[in-house]
Amino acid sequence: MRAKDIRAKAGDEPITMLTAYDAPTAEIAEAAGVDVLLVGDSVGNTRLGYDSTLPVTVDEMASHTAAVARATDDALVVADMPFLSFGADEADAVDNCGRMLKEADADAVKLECGPHTVSLTKTLSDLGIPVQAHLGLTPQRENETGLYRQGTDEESANRILELAREHEAAGAFSLVLEHVPANLAASVTDALSIPTIGIGAGPDCDGQVLVVDEVVGLAEGTAPFSKRFGDVRGEMREAIEAYTDAVDSGSFPGDEHSHYEDDIEDIY
């Protein structure tokens, strides 16, 4: 799968996208039919113990992206560019994004976008680095906007639509729309020739993306626009409790889990 293959799905077949942060998750998700694996900066608060995505570094993203890429054969691997890895200096941004393809074997990068990323999107696209744009709620700007629904009034909705058009013209191959009204997402989808992938953006986008921890039930809670499809957290706790109980009771390890050599004499 390449960026051009995802772009070709616009208005055709639904796109499934899911976060992945490690090789086992990537392998399972790809086997389950996921089209796009997003190595999200949400690795910060799902795997690394941070309170938000803001502390995540380029090195951390490269490491997790490489792990996902090593376990992936067909799905498109998209590396999320972390806070302050782009936007201030274009040359630095190109270097950081280039690392994700050269060192981590990603297929594309995702940028949380605004007016400042239109030029960068064109530069990256011209250099052969596929860009997935991200508009609406952009968590890296939480200190400015808060983690609230975006595009809820005419002015902000028009701004999102215009930025979507500008990033498409700059070369973005797809667009993530997060936590925006469903009717706005539908309008943006109709206005673009590249696919839109929604998260909390209603049913009319070309695809959907969710955080894997929420999908499988590993997270303690879920976003209001997400859905749990399993209870991995409960199953993990049950299995670990069974293990600790077995060790405490002396029932593990048993003879079937132990190996003895008849020709070794008692050393005592």
Swiss-Prot record:
Q: Which residues of the sequence carry a binding annotation for 3-methyl-2-oxobutanoate?
A: D41, S42, D80, K110
- Pfam families in the cross-refs: Pantoate_transf
Q: Example GO molecular function term? A: magnesium ion binding
Q: How is the cofactor bound?
A: Binds 1 Mg(2+) ion per subunit.
Subcellular location as annotated: Cytoplasm
Instruction: Please name the pathway.
Output: Cofactor biosynthesis; coenzyme A biosynthesis
Q: Which InterPro entries match?
A: Pantoate_hydroxy_MeTrfase, Pyrv/PenolPyrv_kinase-like_dom, Pyrv_kinase-like_dom_sf
The residues that the entry says bind Mg(2+) are D41, D80, E112
E.C. code = 2.1.2.11
Q: Which UniProt keywords apply?
A: Coenzyme A biosynthesis, Cytoplasm, Magnesium, Metal-binding, Transferase
Claim: Iron is one of the keywords in the record: no
User: From which domain of life does this come?
Assistant: Archaea
GO biological process assignments: coenzyme A biosynthetic process; pantothenate biosynthetic process
Active-site residues, Swiss-Prot/TrEMBL: E178 (proton acceptor)
Q: Provide the catalytic activity annotation.
A: 3-methyl-2-oxobutanoate + (6R)-5,10-methylene-5,6,7,8-tetrahydrofolate + H2O = 2-dehydropantoate + (6S)-5,6,7,8-tetrahydrofolate
| Essential cofactor(s) | Mg(2+)
What Gene Ontology cellular component terms go with this record? cytoplasm
NCBIfam families linked: panB, PRK00311.1
Quaternary structure, from the entry = Homodecamer; pentamer of dimers.
| Described purpose of this protein according to its UniProt entry | Catalyzes the reversible reaction in which hydroxymethyl group from 5,10-methylenetetrahydrofolate is transferred onto alpha-ketoisovalerate to form ketopantoate.
Q: Which family does it belong to?
A: Belongs to the PanB family.
- UniProt-recorded name of the protein: 3-methyl-2-oxobutanoate hydroxymethyltransferase
Q: Which organism is it from?
A: Natronomonas pharaonis (strain ATCC 35678 / DSM 2160 / CIP 103997 / JCM 8858 / NBRC 14720 / NCIMB 2260 / Gabara)
